[in-house]
Every structure is written in structure tokens, then in C-alpha cells.
Regions:
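Alpha/beta enzyme core
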Residues: 1-31, 41-63, 67-174
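Calponin-homology-like cytoskeleton-binding modules
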Residues: 38
Length: 174
């Protein structure tokens, strides 16, 4: 089985150079990745480099902390779509979730999904900062808000995904 078409080739480093992104796109084309995930300022470059391929362009919003306003995230998402993003990875507002502001969290995801239109929206939970109960709530809120996927982590916090987190998320969203 070819697993390459399940991979999001990613470079979200603050110091990523244009040459790094060119290399990322070339690698994605070579192995047949599902997408490249880059910071928003590289969307248009990636669209140009990946034109004529099946590799999608994904970007991040509210990254990596998730603590900006809903309005900022909605603007970022709409701008990313306008620039050509096929997929958007948003970081959930962790503080709002922890403070049990569930309607805020659900509304934010819903508004960003609306800004994305028919594009894929993935919600990053940052599981290493959440309790099991918070992971379950975040998954349920994401599903209710019509997000397409939930993801475990940004890769920029304490640690990344754990098998336990993935199992819990899978049990919750199906």
C-alpha cells in the first residue's frame, strides 16, 4: 500500500526560506503526498509550484497558539482561501475550551468553516495541553461545527501525538 498519499508534507517553521518551500513542494510531487502544509505567506508560491499535480496546498490559521480573536481567524481563513488554499488547519482556542466557553469554541469553528466554503477545515486540538474530558469536548464541538477533521497537535508545544490521544479522538468522532 502506498502511504505517501496520506501524508501532509509540512514546513511551518518561522525561518522557512523560499528555497525550503520549493524543496518541500518538489518532495511532495516526487512521493505523491496528499498536500503540503505551509505558513500563509507561501500559499501562492505552492499553488504555482504544484499546478497540474494532485498535491493540495494547506495552510494554518491561528497558529500555533490559537489565542487570537475569532474575527482574526475568520479573516485569515478567508484570505487563505482567496490566495488558493485547498485546506485550512486552525488551532482551537485552548483557553476558551478550558474555561468551558463551549459556545464560543463551537461558534469560532463554525464561522471559520463558513469562511472556508467547500474547502477542508481541520481543527488542531493541542492534546498535550488538554485533559481527556477536554479532548472529548473539543472533538464533539468540532464535529457539531461541521469541521472535516480533528488533529492532535501543532508540533510546537510540549509534545506531539500520543496513541492514547488518537484512540480517544477516534472513539469520539468516529
Amino acid at each position: 500500500m502506498n502511504y505517501a498519499n496520506l501524508i501532509d508534507d509540512t514546513n511551518l517553521h518561522a525561518d522557512a526560506l523560499e528555497s525550503d518551500i520549493v524543496d518541500l513542494c518538489n518532495e511532495a510531487k516526487e512521493i505523491g503526498s496528499a498536500s503540503v502544509c505551509v505558513n500563509p505567506d507561501y500559499i501562492e508560491l505552492c499553488k504555482k509550484l504544484l499546478n497540474g499535480t494532485n498535491v493540495k496546498v494547506c495552510t494554518v490559521i491561528g497558529f500555533p497558539l490559537g489565542s487570537m480573536t475569532t474575527e482574526s481567524k475568520v479573516f485569515e481563513a478567508a484570505d487563505a482561501i482567496k490566495k488558493g488554499a485547498d485546506e485550512v488547519d486552525m488551532v482551537i482556542n485552548i483557553s476558551k475550551l478550558k474555561d468551558h466557553h463551549d459556545e464560543y469554541v463551537k461558534n469560532e469553528i463554525s464561522r471559520i468553516k463558513e469562511a472556508c466554503g467547500n474547502r477542508v477545515l481541520k481543527v488542531i486540538l493541542e492534546c498535550c495541553l488538554l485533559s481527556d474530558e477536554e479532548i472529548v469536548r473539543a472533538c464533539k464541538l468540532s464535529k457539531e461545527a461541521k469541521a472535516d477533521f480533528v488533529k492532535t497537535s501543532t508540533g510546537f508545544s510540549k509534545h506531539g501525538a500520543t496513541v492514547k490521544d488518537v484512540k480517544l479522538m477516534r472513539q469520539t468522532v468516529g
